[in-house]
């Protein structure tokens, strides 16, 4: 039997009933939106609680029939046959409910900023950055998420030395947060005549997109410098200083944006800075909460090698959970769900183990 927090379950069910009652009273639109959002969050949990309660009653009734010596033998035998599948169903439902009741990461529902940078491997690393960006872009398209490139630095023979983009939609960060780290590729470059396999790497950083209410940036904590933005061949693309560099003085974090519009550069640089500062804050809080826990999916350290893409063998291996899939082509086309769901499941298992240990 799975241990479930009965008091909390009752509180959630009561809260759900209160929300239902308040929504039925036709509140103003602002209040209704807030209630509807909380209702949507609670509905799957409360549905599972009610199904589990009904199942528990059904099992109790069957056990009463079985234990009653006055009950017809055939009826008792029938009840005995019905019990095992109900116990199996109950066990499955309890595990699902246990996952639903796990503490929510407040950043999970947020959009994300993804930063991909070439590591070791020169031109091959830049090409690999291009492959990774297209992979995430196709994955995002499958979920109808919006992808917008904030800045890019193209490689000499293709791909990108660096590319930064926003991926907007509900729950983006919950799906992509385990992608942060070093991704390694093993393949034979097109220019390699001897057929020798080269190893290159790229670093991925996935940050929850932060709103102004999430993180405050005080004007006195930043220094904004402007400079001329250069176009192709080093020519100035306009006559004004349009490139923007923002330095966060307390942390030393620096963000540069060099598109044509100075106003847009400033806004986007602040957007990236806000996300990086929020990410630091979240990681510090998580570190304090779980100093004793070592999650199997890894620490989220961006220097940690998390995954290898081996072209000759057509395989992708995630080193954090020792999962190898022989479908490299499909994964690079954006078929990431099997990998991502396995990482989420592993993380949830680690959380449950921690909760059991604390309990």
From Swiss-Prot:
Cystine crosslinks: none
Q: Which UniProt keywords apply?
A: Cytoplasm, Methylation, Protein biosynthesis
Write out the function statement from the record.
Answer: Peptide chain release factor 1 directs the termination of translation in response to the peptide chain termination codons UAG and UAA.
Membership in a protein family:
Belongs to the prokaryotic/mitochondrial release factor family.
GO-annotated cellular components: cytoplasm
Recorded hits in SUPFAM superfamilies, A to Z, give: Release factor
Q: Does the keyword Cytoplasm apply?
A: yes
Q: Where in the cell is it found?
A: Cytoplasm
Q: Where is this region: Disordered?
A: 284-311
Q: Which Pfam families match?
A: PCRF, RF-1
Describe the PTM: Methylated by PrmC. Methylation increases the termination efficiency of RF1.
Q: Which InterPro entries match?
A: PCRF (IPR005139), Pep_chain_release_fac_I (IPR000352), Pep_chain_release_fac_I_sf (IPR045853), Prokaryotic/Mito_RF (IPR050057), RF-1 (IPR004373)
According to UniProt, the name of this protein is Peptide chain release factor 1
- N5-methylglutamine is carried by which residues? 235
GO terms (molecular function) for this protein are: translation release factor activity, codon specific
